[in-house]
Amino acid sequence: MADSRPKPANKTPPKSPGEPAKDKAAKRLSLEAEGAGEGAAAAGAELSALEEAFRKFAVHGDARASGREMHGKNWSKLCRDCQVIDGRSVTVTDVDIVFSKIKGKSCRTITFEQFKEALEELAKKRFKDKSAEEAVREVHKLIEGKAPIISGVTKAISSPTVSRLTDTSKFTGSHKERFDPSGRGKGRAGRVDLVDESGYVPGYKHAGTYDQKVQGGK
C-alpha cells in the first residue's frame, strides 16, 4: 500500500541565474587578496642595504659560503674597506677584540644579528661625539651598498730567463727562421724548406727587377 502522506516541500530556495557569477567574483577577489598579501610578505623579505653588504663580504673568497655567516678574516676586510677602521679611534686590534667578544666560544663565524651587535660596539669608539643611535647610523652608512675591494692583482715580472725564451728577436738558428721581424710566426714556411724555382740564387735581393731596369733604360 502506497504512502499517501504528502512529502515535505524543499525549503532551500533555488539559486537565481546570477548567483554562480557572484560566487566566481567573490572567489576571484579572495585569490587576489591572498596574492597581494604574499607580495607584501615578499617585499618585506627583501634584504636591506646593510645585510646585502654583509652577504657580499661574507662570501668573498669562498665559493662555498652561503652568505649567512661571516668569518673573522672577512669581518676585518669589511671594516678596512668600509673605513670603519680609521687607525685612531678604531684599529685592527679593536676589530679583532669585538669579533672574539661577539661570536660564540666554539664558533668561528658571526651571523647578521651578531654583526649588528659588533657594529654597535665599534660605533661607540668610532663616533664618540655622537649619541649611541646616531653613532650606529653613521657606521651603517659607511657599510651600506659597499662590496669587497679587489686589490693586489699579480703583475708580470720580466726576467732574463723569460725574456730569452719569449723574445723572438733573440732567437737563433732554425728557431729564428720561424718568425718574421715583427715576431709573428711564419707558419709552414718557417718550418719547411720550400723549393725556390725562380732561377735566382738564394739570398739574391733584386729578383724580379730586371724588366724594370730594362724599361727604365730605354
UniProtKB/Swiss-Prot annotation:
<feature type="modified residue" description="Phosphoserine">
    <location>
        <position position="158"/>
    </location>
</feature>
<dbReference type="GO" id="GO:0001578">
    <property type="term" value="P:microtubule bundle formation"/>
</dbReference>
<feature type="region of interest" description="Disordered">
    <location>
        <begin position="165"/>
        <end position="192"/>
    </location>
</feature>
<feature type="glycosylation site" description="O-linked (GlcNAc) serine">
    <location>
        <position position="151"/>
    </location>
</feature>
<dbReference type="GO" id="GO:0150051">
    <property type="term" value="C:postsynaptic Golgi apparatus"/>
</dbReference>
<keyword id="KW-0963">Cytoplasm</keyword>
<feature type="modified residue" description="Phosphothreonine">
    <location>
        <position position="91"/>
    </location>
</feature>
<dbReference type="GO" id="GO:0031643">
    <property type="term" value="P:positive regulation of myelination"/>
</dbReference>
<dbReference type="GO" id="GO:0014003">
    <property type="term" value="P:oligodendrocyte development"/>
</dbReference>
<keyword id="KW-0597">Phosphoprotein</keyword>
<dbReference type="GO" id="GO:0030953">
    <property type="term" value="P:astral microtubule organization"/>
</dbReference>
<dbReference type="GO" id="GO:0000287">
    <property type="term" value="F:magnesium ion binding"/>
</dbReference>
<protein>
    <recommendedName>
        <fullName>Tubulin polymerization-promoting protein</fullName>
        <ecNumber>3.6.5.-</ecNumber>
    </recommendedName>
</protein>
<feature type="region of interest" description="Mediates interaction with LIMK1">
    <location>
        <begin position="1"/>
        <end position="115"/>
    </location>
</feature>
<dbReference type="Pfam" id="PF05517">
    <property type="entry name" value="p25-alpha"/>
</dbReference>
<dbReference type="GO" id="GO:0072686">
    <property type="term" value="C:mitotic spindle"/>
</dbReference>
<dbReference type="InterPro" id="IPR011992">
    <property type="entry name" value="EF-hand-dom_pair"/>
</dbReference>
<keyword id="KW-0378">Hydrolase</keyword>
<dbReference type="InterPro" id="IPR008907">
    <property type="entry name" value="TPP/p25"/>
</dbReference>
<feature type="modified residue" description="Phosphothreonine">
    <location>
        <position position="12"/>
    </location>
</feature>
<feature type="binding site">
    <location>
        <position position="82"/>
    </location>
    <ligand>
        <name>Zn(2+)</name>
    </ligand>
</feature>
<feature type="binding site">
    <location>
        <position position="60"/>
    </location>
    <ligand>
        <name>Zn(2+)</name>
    </ligand>
</feature>
<dbReference type="GO" id="GO:0042803">
    <property type="term" value="F:protein homodimerization activity"/>
</dbReference>
<comment type="subunit">
    <text>Homodimer. Binds tubulin; binding is inhibited by GTP. Interacts with MAPK1. Interacts with GAPDH; the interaction is direct. Interacts with LIMK1 (via the PDZ domain); the interaction is direct. Interacts with LIMK2. Interacts with HDAC6; thereby inhibiting the tubulin deacetylase activity of HDAC6. Interacts with aggregated SNCA; may have a pro-aggregatory role in synucleinopathies. Interacts with DYNLL1. Interacts (via C-terminus) with S100A2, S100A6 and S100B; these interactions inhibit TPPP dimerization.</text>
</comment>
<comment type="function">
    <text>Regulator of microtubule dynamics that plays a key role in myelination by promoting elongation of the myelin sheath. Acts as a microtubule nucleation factor in oligodendrocytes: specifically localizes to the postsynaptic Golgi apparatus region, also named Golgi outpost, and promotes microtubule nucleation, an important step for elongation of the myelin sheath. Required for both uniform polarized growth of distal microtubules as well as directing the branching of proximal processes. Shows magnesium-dependent GTPase activity; the role of the GTPase activity is unclear.</text>
</comment>
<dbReference type="GO" id="GO:0032273">
    <property type="term" value="P:positive regulation of protein polymerization"/>
</dbReference>
<dbReference type="GO" id="GO:0048471">
    <property type="term" value="C:perinuclear region of cytoplasm"/>
</dbReference>
<keyword id="KW-0132">Cell division</keyword>
<keyword id="KW-0460">Magnesium</keyword>
<keyword id="KW-0479">Metal-binding</keyword>
<keyword id="KW-0539">Nucleus</keyword>
<dbReference type="GO" id="GO:0005634">
    <property type="term" value="C:nucleus"/>
</dbReference>
<dbReference type="GO" id="GO:0070507">
    <property type="term" value="P:regulation of microtubule cytoskeleton organization"/>
</dbReference>
<feature type="modified residue" description="Phosphoserine">
    <location>
        <position position="106"/>
    </location>
</feature>
<dbReference type="GO" id="GO:0032288">
    <property type="term" value="P:myelin assembly"/>
</dbReference>
<feature type="binding site">
    <location>
        <position position="71"/>
    </location>
    <ligand>
        <name>Zn(2+)</name>
    </ligand>
</feature>
<dbReference type="GO" id="GO:0031334">
    <property type="term" value="P:positive regulation of protein-containing complex assembly"/>
</dbReference>
<dbReference type="GO" id="GO:0003924">
    <property type="term" value="F:GTPase activity"/>
</dbReference>
<dbReference type="GO" id="GO:0005737">
    <property type="term" value="C:cytoplasm"/>
</dbReference>
<dbReference type="GO" id="GO:0015631">
    <property type="term" value="F:tubulin binding"/>
</dbReference>
<dbReference type="GO" id="GO:0051418">
    <property type="term" value="P:microtubule nucleation by microtubule organizing center"/>
</dbReference>
<dbReference type="GO" id="GO:0046785">
    <property type="term" value="P:microtubule polymerization"/>
</dbReference>
